Swiss-Prot record:
Species this protein is from: Vibrio cholerae serotype O1 (strain ATCC 39541 / Classical Ogawa 395 / O395)
NCBIfam families in UniProt: glycerol3P_GlpB, PRK05329.1-2, PRK05329.1-3
Keyword Oxidoreductase listed: yes
Protein's pathway: Polyol metabolism; glycerol degradation via glycerol kinase pathway; glycerone phosphate from sn-glycerol 3-phosphate (anaerobic route): step 1/1
Cited InterPro entries: FAD-dep_OxRdtase_2_FAD-bd (IPR003953), FAD/NAD-bd_sf (IPR036188), G3P_DH_GlpB_su (IPR009158), Metab_Enz_Cyan_OpOx_G3PDH (IPR051691)
Protein name listed in UniProt: Anaerobic glycerol-3-phosphate dehydrogenase subunit B
Assembly, per entry: Composed of a catalytic GlpA/B dimer and of membrane bound GlpC.
Length: 436
């Protein structure tokens, strides 16, 4: 049997955050994840809280946590608390900074808007260096939207039309420019087959790189905001964006595209690299299929690939995600947590799972369904609390990450809080030194 201090189940942003925090504290950590995480579909920014459950727009996310606690006492943020939530987010920022993916937030702690691929504005709190933090006061003379010939996952006309409907941008000139990058012929079989990964590989060629720079400098000025799809990477995306800015002297705003999202991949690669370089053990491509319980403790877990070799740990952190990652499974009449059959908060009346209108002004109830935890994020199984198991991230009940704009923030805050409690147990059991 393989034994660890901490076993983390799930390799999304919550799982990696928990594993890294434990590893940084000197613990022996194993991370088990089934495959690619939802970070490959993400914006690459970290949303803390964009809207309260009653629909009120949030400007200062941490200040709003007291109002959130009054509205939803069982919200994950309500269990973690403001102080620990802030500590967790700042820890994550420092961790990514040290992994060469610096994230920025506004000096006053407020949310900023990021311009989305659809030309809408979305509240967020931490963004990557080439995501423009819009606060409603444009400090650019024009918006230049870059379309790349043959690239099908970016719709510049839609972005421009939606952005032009913003009252504060009504008098800001917007233009769309097409750029061609030589060398596409070897990557595609039809005119619109290219993906962001294809372009990223192509731009490693000097001729393609120089062609892109030359065309951008001809159509844009230093006082413009140049919006372009995230096509730089993978592995060296931020380095290439910095180089592009230095060569062209332009101000860029990267927008994520259809999957794979290079902005999200940057974060996952940074987390993975930090975990492996720090000495963590990762079982990638494996899946936890069950566990052994003794009283109120989880004593061992079993994986699909290591059926005859159970994994044991002093503490377990579970971050298997929601429906998308199969951390929760929905049948016609019930929601289940499939790995350990943990207790799930849900409404037994299927008709109450959603509103009559798909696009509604409020959260659909099923989005708040998830694993029930106590104030310390311990789940229960058949009504019995599991004392050495913590749950975090999208599998938790009591919140809607989409409606509230808080998915990344909750994932990081709950993972950090779970591991801080684990570390506290070691501090409590540490024997005092005897001075002779």
């Amino acid at each position: 049997m393989m034994h660890y201090d901490v076993a983390v189940i799930g390799g999304g942003i919550a799982g990696y955050s928990a594993a890294l925090r434990a590893l940084q504290a000197g613990k022996k950590v194993v991370l088990i994840n089934q495959g690619q995480s939802a970070l490959h579909f993400s914006s690459g920014s970290i949303d803390v809280l964009g809207r309260l459950p009653d629909g009120s727009v949030v400007n200062q996310p941490f200040d709003a946590l007291s109002a959130l606690q009054q509205q939803v006492p069982e919200h994950p943020y309500s269990k973690v608390g403001r102080k620990n939530s802030e500590k967790g987010l700042m820890w994550f920022k420092r961790t990514l900074d040290s992994a060469h993916v610096p994230l920025h937030h506004e000096p006053d702690g407020a949310n900023h808007w990021r311009i989305t691929p659809l030309g809408t504005l979305k509240n967020t709190w931490l963004s990557q260096p080439f995501v423009y933090p819009y606060r409603g006061n444009a400090d650019f003379s024009r918006i230049v939207i870059v379309a790349i010939d043959g690239y099908r996952d970016f719709q510049p006309a839609m972005l421009r039309d939606n952005l032009a409907q913003r009252p504060e941008l009504a008098n800001t000139p917007m233009l769309t420019v097409n750029v061609s990058i030589p060398g596409f012929e070897g990557f595609r079989r039809n005119p619109n087959e290219l993906r962001s990964i294809d372009i990223a590989r192509l731009l490693r060629q000097e001729s393609a790189w120089n062609a892109l720079c030359d065309q951008l400098m001809r159509v844009a000025r230093p006082d413009d905001l140049v919006i372009m799809p995230a096509i730089m990477g993978n592995g060296d995306g931020l380095h290439l964006m910095t180089k592009l800015q230095q060569v062209t002297q332009l101000r860029f705003h990267e927008v994520p595209t259809m999957p794979p999202s290079l902005l999200g991949i940057r974060i996952e690669e940074a987390l993975h690299r930090s975990f492996i370089q720090g000495g963590g053990v990762q079982l990638k491509g494996d899946k936890v299929i069950g566990g052994d319980f003794a009283g109120s403790r989880l004593t061992a877990i079993h994986t699909q690939n290591l059926r005859d070799f159970p994994i044991s740990a002093e503490h377990y952190v579970m971050a298997t995600g929601s429906y998308f990652s199969q951390g929760l499974q929905a049948s016609q009449h019930a929601i289940q947590e499939p790995t350990f059959a943990l207790d799930v908060q849900q409404n037994p009346d299927r008709a109450q799972w959603r509103h009559a209108q798909f696009i509604a002004a409020q959260s659909h109830p099923f989005m708040t369904f998830g694993v029930i935890t106590d104030a310390n994020l311990h789940p229960s199984r058949q009504g019995k609390t599991i004392d050495n198991l913590w749950c975090c991230g999208a599998m938790l009940s009591g919140y809607d990450p989409v409606f509230e704009g808080c998915g990344g923030g909750v994932a990081i805050a709950t993972a950090y809080h779970a591991v801080e409690q684990i570390l506290a147990t070691y501090a409590q059991t540490k024997q005092p030194e005897v001075l002779l």
